[in-house]
Amino acid sequence: ISSLDNSTIIVMRFSFGPTDVPRWKRQQFPDVSYDEYQYISKYMPDTEAASFSLNVPSTSIKFEENSVSNVEIGAVTYEYYDIEALQIAEGRFFNESESNSGTPVIILGDEIAKTLFPSTLALGKKVRLYGRKFVVIGVLKKEGSGLFGGSKDTAVFIPVNMARKIFGDNNKSTFPQIIVKPEKGIDNEGYIADLTQKIRMARGLKPDDINDFFINQLKGFKDVIDDITGTMNGIGWVISGFSLLVG
């Protein structure tokens, strides 16, 4: 997992690995929310950035007569650009205003752009997905294949608040996660303890209530996968591929 820092934390209702919490109990856990992402962004100290993302169904993308099917959609807030250190070949990523308002803009992976626009520039064009039109404002640099065959070359990114307009906040075909990047050099255990307490406080949990969420450390997950596979390359499936872990 190369493009996300090892210190990155994923907060959601699922655990990356084995847990002592029984399955029936885990199934009762609520999803993390956009409000909780905002709470963490505002009140969690020593945080470089936090991003809210929504795992949404893959779909077809069309431009005039050209189309690409089964495209993975990264529905994220604007901070994700810096958290994953995405690289733009043309144009730009969406900004805070576009992220907050859910503007229908889109960033295309390299292969998606080349398939939809083989002989013309993609920027400024309107593509269609989920029955909506999105303006292309950026194209990612070519990345190559990832560990599980996934790659941002065959993915696109849209503002998560646009995805929320389409799917709502309680759609069973989606699940959300909060991606948190601590500042460098901080005490990791202390940070996680503070983050845990902040989320418990936001949820109004009592002292004897168990955590109804999981704080997943990317480093621990990476170590497990590295033991199985050796070197890892890329994490284009972080947003769209968690179904491998929970489904």
Give the predicted meaning of each segment:
Residues P45-A49, L121, L244:
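Glycine-centered tight turns that cap/initiate beta-strands
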Residues I1, I179, N188, I192, ...:
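Peri-transmembrane interface segments
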Residues D31-D35, L108, S119-L121, G220, ...:
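Short, conserved clusters of charged catalytic residues that mark active-site
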Residues I1-E72, E79-D82, T115, I186, ...:
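Hydrophobic, regular-secondary-structure patches
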Residues G74, Y78-F94, T103-D208:
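Mid-to-C-terminal secondary-structure elements
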